[in-house]
């Protein structure tokens, strides 16, 4: 339950107080946001519209792209608008809402990457039973589990912040409401709360990252035992997923696998995994996947010159 406090709004410092720098950042982040939304929604629509992309991996890819689009919308529009404002403020309820939604979709993204790694494991190690194991009901169940995991983690984060008192100051040294900058403003000792946040966020992030690396190692090792062609494809077969895992988890590990503290570089690392990575997602999958490229070309009205059914796989 929230304790009494005299804070009704927070002031976000953002990146810079210089107008010229703010204008340049406004243009840059606006373009990034537009590209992010167009790219991710293009993947979602292409997968829904294409009769050839019915494999479970594309179902999860569409979900990942949709979540990335929503996740980016949680942060980028506020950042873009604030760059045009002299006083960057956010109300207490809006700040709590942003914190909850950001963690909800960010954590769902993390769990969905685990689900996609499992999907690739089944497709590679049990190809004859792939469609039987990864049937429609299982895919929906795995998606629900990913969303539930993100929801529970977000509830914990919001309860931690909401239950502690804010007495001032109300200046957040960040461009949005994030957990560590908010804990710095609490009027009580947050040492043990910080340890709980590290365990809940950082440790889980590290464990999942390690499990993902192990799973990709198992997949690559399994591919090498198949045939000369399998050995040739081994370095590339799951590269799209692996690249996304590295881009997302490395900044998160640096930010959350440590005691509660804030550094100037935190803002730039947060931009990388919350603004840049969702933009890169569609390009990585389009460049690494010929089926995805063909589906987008067909959606946009281009003739790919190829017909017929193609086995669904990422390469």
UniProtKB/Swiss-Prot annotation:
Q: What does this protein do?
A: Odorant receptor.
Q: Which residues lie on this side of the membrane: Extracellular?
A: 1-24, 81-95, 161-193, 257-266
The entry's family comment says: Belongs to the G-protein coupled receptor 1 family.
Q: Which organism is it from?
A: Homo sapiens (Human)
**Protein name in the entry:** Olfactory receptor 4A8
Please give the residue ranges for the topological domain Cytoplasmic.
Answer: 46-57, 117-139, 215-235, 288-315
Specify one Pfam family.
Answer: 7tm_4
**Glycan attachment positions:** 6
Report the SS bond pairs. Answer: 95-177
Q: Name one GO cellular component term.
A: plasma membrane
């Amino acid at each position: 339950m929230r304790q009494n406090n005299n804070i009704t709004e927070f002031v976000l410092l953002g990146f810079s107080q210089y107008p010229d720098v703010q204008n340049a950042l406004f243009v840059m982040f606006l373009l990034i946001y537009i590209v992010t939304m167009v790219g991710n929604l293009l993947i979602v629509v292409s997968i829904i519209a294409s009769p050839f992309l019915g494999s479970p991996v594309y179902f999860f890819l569409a979900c990942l792209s949709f979540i990335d689009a929503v996740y980016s919308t949680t942060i980028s529009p506020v950042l873009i608008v604030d760059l045009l404002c002299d006083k960057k403020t956010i109300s207490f309820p809006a700040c709590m809402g942003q914190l909850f939604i950001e963690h909800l979709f960010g954590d769902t993204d993390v769990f969905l990457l685990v689900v996609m790694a499992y999907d690739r494991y089944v497709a590679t190690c049990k190809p004859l039973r792939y469609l039987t194991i990864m049937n429609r009901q299982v895919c929906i169940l795995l998606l629900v589990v990913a969303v539930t995991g993100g929801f529970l983690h977000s509830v914990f984060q919001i309860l931690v912040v909401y239950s502690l008192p804010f007495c001032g100051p109300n200046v957040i040294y960040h461009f949005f409401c994030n957990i560590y900058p908010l804990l710095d403003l609490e009027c009580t000792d947050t040492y043990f709360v910080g340890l709980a946040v590290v365990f809940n966020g950082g440790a889980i992030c590290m464990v999942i990252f390690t499990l993902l690396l192990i799973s990709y190692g198992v997949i690559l090792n399994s591919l090498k035992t198949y045939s000369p062609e399998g050995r040739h494809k081994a370095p590339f077969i799951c590269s799209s997923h692996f690249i996304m895992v590295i881009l997302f988890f490395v900044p998160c590990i640096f930010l959350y696998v440590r005691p509660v503290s804030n550094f100037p570089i935190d803002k730039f690392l947060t931009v990388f995994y919350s603004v840049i990575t969702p933009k890169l997602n569609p390009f990585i999958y389009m460049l690494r996947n010929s089926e995805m490229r063909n589906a987008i070309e067909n959606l946009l009205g281009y003739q790919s010159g190829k017909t017929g059914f193609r086995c669904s796989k990422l390469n």
